[in-house]
Amino acid sequence: MAVGMLTVPQAVAYALLAGLPAQAGLYACLAPMVIHALLSSSRQLIVGPVAIAALMVASTVGQHAAAYSDAYLGITTVLSLQVGVILILLRALQVGGIVNLLSHPVISGFVNGAAVVIIISQLAPLTGIATTSRVDDGAVDRIVLLVRFVTEVNPTAIALGVGSLLLMAAVRRWGPALVRSGAKVGGDGDVRHALGRTGPVLVTVLGTAVVAGFGLDVGVVGSVPAGLPELTLPLLDAQLWWDLAPNAVLIALVAFVESYSIGKTLAARQRRRIDSHQELLALGAANIGASLSGAYPVAGSFSRSSVNYASGARTPASALVCAVIIVLTLLWLTPLFANLPHAVLAAVVIVAVYELADFRSVVRDWRFYRGDVLTHFATFAGVLLAGVEAGLLIGVGISVVLFMRGSARPHIAVVGRLGDTPHFRNVKRYEVRTWSHLVAARVDESFYFANADTLESRLAELVDNPEGMPEDGDSAGGQAVEHLLIIMSAVNFIDTTGLEMLQRLTHRLARRDVAVHFCEIKGPVRDQLEHVAVDEWLTGRVFQTTDDAFNTLTEAAGKWIWRDVPANTRD
């Protein structure tokens, strides 16, 4: 029941954000919600209209038609169908892992940027300014228009909007405490949490009553047709489908990442797991249902799913109860929307997206890995300045470049034996035993095109000047390097460029009477090497373990060297 009450104002608000009539938001809560409940492996996830998807719809469809028009709605149903088909194709091809391209910094920067854009877009209705902005306008364009029309603010609308913001904040902050100190409604924290999120329902009811009772001169939703949605067949326009496809892919990926993350988080609280493949199917089918019922793309809702969980829902039946409330609203309560003020709906949207934004993680990332901070702010700035789709692509591009940059300069550690144990550690970090005729190098990366040249150069340099070992060999009887042992415990694959690099390195060192050996090879990599007859070109041997290699290559080596390193170092 609580979820259904929260869904109604959010559905109407997000529909207007997407550039659609209010009923389209309610339609997005019927067929999609029921279909997802029947197919999903998550017990608490509630799908329907969400702010991020609404913004992406406005950005995409606004390029092809005027908001709130029949043509706009028709294009939106095509977009919903494409999103659904893409998700089901990902399930059929079992390539759902493609969503991993959207790393946490990309998603965080995208959500934070989108939240700022959405909040800026709601400042006009919040203040009663009737601007001429398009739904696909960016943040900068909207700010310029707000400044241009600042003299047209409506004090009454501002009072309603700001009052709604304050009331929702108060309910969120003190509502649970009031329940706890008063009568024990349900008695536990989950119920208090759910009641703390009923602010949107309260401000919607009060705002509508105040406007209707006092006849206030503010922008309102107006007439909303009653009745259930009719079957809608998407437009069959090949050029339109082609134009929408790139953005449909992005919306599908963002919708799935958002939905799956919420579902996984809620399932973990019950020590359960959800099936990512099943979630692809369920969300895809839900979006197809949205298309056929005149709605726009749907995704998992964080706020409604949280309320659903906090209310004690443990089966998908709760989503069906929510759908019943939407049906009742469409059949008998739509006249009430006539006096629902835009300022109140803007406040509902602002509070919802404010809860999604998370800038605190940036501080943590700065201390841990600053490349993630760069990705976050590049995505954030891209969304603000270039649009949501461009910002997302910028973030993905930078994260891939940073990954390639890191793997192109892999960490290589020269290791030695830790005392008389079968364990080996970095000579720069531990007190270990080494032999000057043997260089044992652990490469902490796979061998592929991006790092092949770097690896060849650095491994050859280690033979000339082994790290942490005497350059002149005086402490080891003047022995020259005779063996290069490549420890491949961190190598997960070798591509053809990496293979050619190993062959070149082997032949290059053979001319200097240095044998190349491999050890700690993983099964898949060993299979790869067997296909290219490694025994025919490798000048050394392939050992099972590093200990085996050291025992064999040092048994007649003579004097070893202690590497004295401070004990407080770390591997």
Identify the role of each PLM range:
Residues G468-A480, L553-D571:
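Intrinsically disordered or compositionally simple regulatory linkers and C-terminal tails
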